[in-house]
Every structure is written in structure tokens, then in C-alpha cells.
């Protein structure tokens, strides 16, 4: 049986945590480099949905926009509660 005949399984959630984590790290670093308070800016973005809270520096705005806000909040809550599984 060739590989084209087999049903492939794709688990979208498998890499979400790492991607969100890496994105938040990059955004945090970009905000810090620009002299902003990273926590305040990220919280402002998450609450309002306004990407203007995130600078274009180091492509931070485009990076964070690749994730839905609810997805980011979900990962933050999981991390905070130690439920990263």
C-alpha cells in the first residue's frame, strides 16, 4: 500500500503551546527593546484586540496576529495553572 492510500492524521493542537509560547517570547522581547512595559502592552492587546498595542518592531505585530486572542489566553491560563498537557 503506498503512502497515498493511507489516511493521514493531523493534530493541530500538538504544537500550539510551543508556537504561542515562542510568539509571546518574541513579542515580549520586541516590546522590551522598544522601551514599553511588555506585560501592560500584551494585556492591552488581549483585552481590546487592538494590534496597535504591539509594535511592528521585529515583526512582533504580525507574529501575534497569527494566533487568535482566545488561543493565547487559553495557553496563558494553562501555563499559569500548570496544565500544559
Curated annotation (Swiss-Prot):
Pfam families in alphabetical order: IreB
Family under the similarity heading: Belongs to the UPF0297 family.
Protein name (Swiss-Prot/TrEMBL): UPF0297 protein LGAS_0422
Organism annotation: Lactobacillus gasseri (strain ATCC 33323 / DSM 20243 / BCRC 14619 / CIP 102991 / JCM 1131 / KCTC 3163 / NCIMB 11718 / NCTC 13722 / AM63)
Amino acid at each position: 500500500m503506498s503512502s497515498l492510500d493511507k489516511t493521514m492524521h493531523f493534530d493541530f493542537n500538538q504544537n500550539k503551546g510551543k508556537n504561542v509560547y515562542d510568539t509571546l517570547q518574541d513579542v515580549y522581547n520586541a516590546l522590551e527593546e522598544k522601551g514599553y512595559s511588555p506585560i501592560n502592552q500584551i494585556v492591552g492587546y488581549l483585552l481590546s484586540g487592538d494590534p496597535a498595542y504591539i509594535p511592528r518592531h521585529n515583526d512582533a505585530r504580525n507574529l501575534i496576529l497569527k494566533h487568535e486572542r482566545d488561543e493565547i489566553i487559553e495557553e496563558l491560563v494553562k501555563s499559569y495553572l500548570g496544565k500544559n498537557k
